From Swiss-Prot:
Subunit structure: Probably interacts with PlsX.
Catalysis: reaction(s): an acyl phosphate + sn-glycerol 3-phosphate = a 1-acyl-sn-glycero-3-phosphate + phosphate
Protein name: Glycerol-3-phosphate acyltransferase
Source organism, top-level taxon: Bacteria
Pathway involvement of the protein, from the record: Lipid metabolism; phospholipid metabolism
Pfam families reported in the protein's UniProt record: G3P_acyltransf
Membrane topology: Multi-pass membrane protein
NCBIfam families: glycerol-3-phosphate 1-O-acyltransferase PlsY
Length: 198
């Protein structure tokens, strides 16, 4: 286990995780099935929520695929008997790839789906907290962005309380970046110009 997860092996694993995270499933599917560039649709964001504005079925498939990016990487690490903190670090790298894909000059999605994949794979309690919080907030306000923001904050607090420092620090860092990516949504909500999903 120590040999496999040594620094010599960790660097290429993190690099591969970044590349997997950077696969733009939303852009690919919308381009293939609808001949449209998702960057010119709605918010211009390359993510499941913006894909929803093209087709609901496509957005659901995008969501599953983006979640699966993190799940795949972490399941492989689990088979390699990696420490939980390494799983969080690698999941963090997948999320970074999703948010900052090299293929689109580091302008990607907002990281919610791969973050869900991380907690689904590592801590099922955080996953359920995230999903339930998102659903409740969305039913009340109908803003996907607000639901995501509150879910990230609540799951981040729970992770900080229940996980050890080495594990929680990576999830907290990941959460901060995801929240920063939602800053424009926060401004639009304050100004009353944020669009409800439906």
């Amino acid at each position: 286990m120590n040999l496999i997860m040594g620094y010599t092996y960790l660097i290429p694993i993190l690099f591969a995780s970044y590349l997997i995270g950077s696969i733009p499933f939303s852009w690919i599917l919308v381009k293939v099935f609808y001949k449209r560039d998702l960057r010119s649709v709605g918010s211009g964001n390359i993510g499941a929520t913006n894909a929803f504005r093209v087709n609901r079925g496509i957005s659901f498939l995008v969501l599953l695929l983006d979640i699966f990016k993190s799940v795949l990487v972490i399941l492989i690490l689990e088979k390699m008997c990696a420490h939980k903190s390494i799983m969080y670090l690698t999941g963090f790298t997948v999320v970074l790839g999703h948010i900052f894909p090299v293929w689109f000059l580091f302008k990607g999605g907002k990281g919610i789906a791969p973050t869900i994949g991380v907690v689904l794979s590592i801590n099922i309690k955080i996953f359920f907290l995230f999903i339930i919080t998102w659903a409740v907030v969305f039913m009340i306000f109908r803003y996907s962005s607000l639901s995501s923001i509150i879910s990230i904050i609540s799951s981040c607090i729970y992770c900080a309380v229940t996980e050890n420092f080495n594990s929680s620090i990576f999830y907290i860092a990941m959460s901060i970046i995801v929240l920063i990516k939602h800053r424009d949504n926060v401004i639009r909500m304050i100004n009353g110009t944020e669009k409800k999903l439906f």
